[in-house]
Structures are given as C-alpha cells and as structure tokens.
Regions:
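A conserved helix-loop-beta module that forms one wall/lid of the active-site cleft
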Residues: 21-96, 105-126
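Phosphate-binding site of ATP-dependent enzymes
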Residues: 111-147
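Residue-level signal for the start and early helices of compact helical domains
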Residues: 5-8, 30, 47-53, 131-133, ...
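Conserved oxyanion/phosphate-binding beta-strand-loop segments in alpha/beta enzyme cores
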Residues: 1-18
C-alpha cells in the first residue's frame, strides 16, 4: 500500500489550517485570554455550556479526591456505558470509553475487558495529574456515552 500525501498548498486550498495559523490567526485574535480558564477545564466548560442550553452528554458524577474512588462501584451500578476523562487533560490523553458491561467486567471501546480495580487506578492517575498539562492535580469527569 502506498501513502498519498497532500501538499500544504492543497490543504490550504481545501480550507485546512495549520496549528500555528489556527492558534495565532483565530483563537488568539477572537478570544480574550481572560476567558481561557473557562475552556481549559472540561468541567467548567460543560457547566457553562449547560447554563446556556448547549446540548451536552449527561454528567453522571465527578471525583475530586482520592478517597472518593472507593465509592465508585455504587455510582456505576446502573451504568453500562460511560466516558471517564480528566477535566484538564489534553490531546485526548486519559480518556477511558466504556461501551458495555458483562458481569463484573467493563468493556472498553477497544473490546478489552477491565475490572473496577483498573477503573480506580485510572481515576487515581487522573487525580494525580498524569494526563493534565504540567502534571497539575485534576478531577475526574464521568459522563454519559453518546452513540
């Protein structure tokens, strides 16, 4: 199989922006820097969007501290599918998509099976800042999976 590459010129003709162009010519130009904290935090963004009636996946619950992780089985008891993610993650890192459940196993979008201990570990890593910019502590967002 051979790869077919499109030139930068062709991408521009199709209206594609490079990251630098996007950031400098659009994001920086049309957005006040003082508002960045509202959109750099997925939980704040979600709550703000809901306040203005923007449709969003339902928020199941939020985990803010390590000790809360021990209670997740009760919170997930009726959840066969959900998305678990860091509030301040970047580039899609740290997102766990659960598409189903069989017995005590949760089924990831990849088809892999994980247990509640794996989910707890993932949450702990998020809280510790493993996926956030600069390694700052974070919160875990658990929301509805939309198909």
């Amino acid at each position: 199989m051979t790869a077919h590459w499109i030139s930068v010129r062709q991408l521009r003709q199709f209206g594609m922006l490079g990251m630098n162009c996007r950031n400098v010519d659009f994001i920086n130009r049309y957005n006040r820097r003082s508002l960045y904290p509202l959109v750099d935090d997925k939980l704040k963004t979600k709550l703000l969007a809901q306040e203005y009636g923007v449709p969003m996946p339902g928020l199941q619950f939020v985990v803010r501290e390590q000790h809360e992780i021990s209670h997740i089985e009760r919170q997930l008891v009726n959840s066969d599918s959900f998305v678990l993610k860091p509030s301040k993650g970047s580039g899609g890192k740290g997102i766990l998509v659960v598409i189903g459940r069989e017995g005590d196993d949760y089924i990831k979008s990849s088809g892999a099976r994980i247990g509640v201990a794996d989910i707890r570990r993932h949450m702990s890593n998020i809280l510790a800042g493993l996926y956030s910019l600069g390694g700052a502590s974070d919160v875990v967002i658990i929301e509805d999976l939309i198909a």
